[in-house]
Amino acid sequence: MKKAIIGKKVGMTQIFDENGRVIPVTVVEAGPCVVVQKKTVETDGYDAIQVGFGELREKLVNKPRKGHFAKAGVSLRRTLKEFRMEDVANYNVGDEIKVDTFEIGDKVDVSGVSKGKGFQGTIKRWNASRGPMSHGSKFHRAPGSMGAASDPSRTFKNKRMPGHMGAKNTTVLNLEVVKIMPEKNIILIKGGIPGPNKGTVVIRNSVKA
């Protein structure tokens, strides 16, 4: 059965297992999410559910989106995501998806927007080697050659150059669920996940598990 939930990254901490070993974990406030729309092969050409997460003030929502939530009979939500599901028949509009849909030991993939680093050079962005820092050298952190001169008379596509780093959709695969606290809507995931604290993340079954 496919599982998915939207959450908010709280931060990182560490816990101890029964043998006293330290496990670094990321704390995620996951759900409760509500089913806002149900899509089926008959009406939309595929099976999926649209899920909402996080409360939102009315003044921040435009009229079409307000109508979308009113039609579903659910309160306004900050984030909307769609998940392809094979068992759509098991869901109804208005149903809540809570963190206890996952179990301890489950393998999950976590998606989010990575931390933005702004404009960065090739050393930080692409792990390029720097030049000598000694006296007399005039080449330290510059990008270096960008290609040949008269032939081909251009810089090839995908040349690693300085530019905007981070702030991209990123997925970390095959992480383990270490602990679940349903009463607080908290899930602890082993290791790090993308994005800053308070960033929105999506937790799904691992595709490689």
UniProtKB/Swiss-Prot annotation:
Annotated region (Disordered), positions in chain: 129-153
InterPro entries the UniProt entry points to: Ribosomal_uL3 (IPR000597), Ribosomal_uL3_bac/org-type (IPR019927), Ribosomal_uL3_CS (IPR019926), Transl_B-barrel_sf (IPR009000)
MF (Gene Ontology): rRNA binding; structural constituent of ribosome
Pfam family, one: Ribosomal_L3
Keywords tagged on the record: Ribonucleoprotein, Ribosomal protein, RNA-binding, rRNA-binding
Disulfides per UniProt: none
PROSITE patterns cross-referenced by the UniProt entry: RIBOSOMAL_L3
Signal peptide location: none
Annotated Gene Ontology cellular component terms: cytosolic large ribosomal subunit
Domain of life: Bacteria
Gene3D superfamilies: 3.30.160.810, Translation factors
GO-annotated biological processes: translation
HAMAP family named in the record: Ribosomal_uL3_B
Family listed: Belongs to the universal ribosomal protein uL3 family.
Subunit structure: Part of the 50S ribosomal subunit. Forms a cluster with proteins L14 and L19.
Described purpose of this protein according to its UniProt entry: One of the primary rRNA binding proteins, it binds directly near the 3'-end of the 23S rRNA, where it nucleates assembly of the 50S subunit.
PANTHER family: 50S RIBOSOMAL PROTEIN L3 (PTHR11229), LARGE RIBOSOMAL SUBUNIT PROTEIN UL3C (PTHR11229:SF16)
Name the record gives this protein: Large ribosomal subunit protein uL3
Originating organism: Clostridium perfringens (strain 13 / Type A)
